[in-house]
Amino acid sequence: MKKIKPDVQKIKAYLPHREVEKKPGTLTRALYDIGLAVWFGGSVFGILAMNPAVEVLDDPEERGKMVDEGWARFQPYGAVGLGLATVAHFLMRARPPKKQTDTYKTVALLKDFFIIGAGVTSVASLALGEYAVDDYAPVESATEGTDETPEDVEKAQSGLSIASIAQLACGIGVLVTGAILASERSKSS
């Protein structure tokens, strides 16, 4: 008896099928989450806890030294964390849901803005922070000078306050838009 070899491609054409959506991989998502946690967690701690806590030190020059050393130790980790989160974010953006809602499209653009803003404000904070506590200038805290603080350092501290608030706002924006996108992605599956 002659064996009949089925034409698999023809058979597949007649069967109902659903194309599988390519979602971001687990590794990409994990790198994004870890990177964002390191950057944002460290930034929140530094801005809201460490910067004002140096006021307990009696010597204003020691305050400047403590702030400078604390941020110098965190900056490489924060930069790597934000870098990982940014790369992973754009990798995930390359795999949007098949059926994108208008909400998804709008919020995805907003998240792009916030993640780029996080990078810009982090660089601004880094630059102003380096200048504000340069040579361990006497300070009250990272963002407040003393009577002995040079005027140019006080101006840098003022800019650092603004950059720090913007940095936290961008971080919150990234987290909120990320939650909305995850919800929208699950609706489209």
Predicted feature locations:
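Short amphipathic, positively biased membrane-proximal segments
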Residues: 1-189
